[in-house]
């Protein structure tokens, strides 16, 4: 199995773990809503891993934009804050 496929498989396992953690977070903390982007954005994430995971790199940078222009502020994935502001 190539590296990209291994990364995709690992991401699927992580997604299952996140799905199991969400109800716990919602019950035990002040979190009202939680989503798992590995579910709703899976096809795109998998394509990314399969395409770029086999390029021989030694580092895979993953992250989230929690700043004032990111999903943590609006709940809108991929930083589409303009869309959220004009719609809401």
Could you say what each language-model-derived stretch is?
Residues 2-88:
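A polyanion-binding, active-site-adjacent surface
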């Amino acid at each position: 199995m190539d590296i990209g496929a291994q990364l995709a498989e690992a991401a699927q396992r992580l997604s299952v773990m996140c799905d199991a953690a969400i109800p716990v977070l919602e019950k035990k903390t002040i979190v009202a809503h939680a989503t798992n982007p590995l579910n709703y954005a899976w096809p795109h994430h998998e394509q990314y891993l399969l395409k770029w995971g086999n390029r021989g790199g030694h580092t895979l940078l993953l992250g989230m934009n929690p700043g004032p222009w990111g999903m943590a502020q609006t709940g809108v994935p991929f930083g589409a804050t303009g869309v959220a502001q004009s719609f809401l």
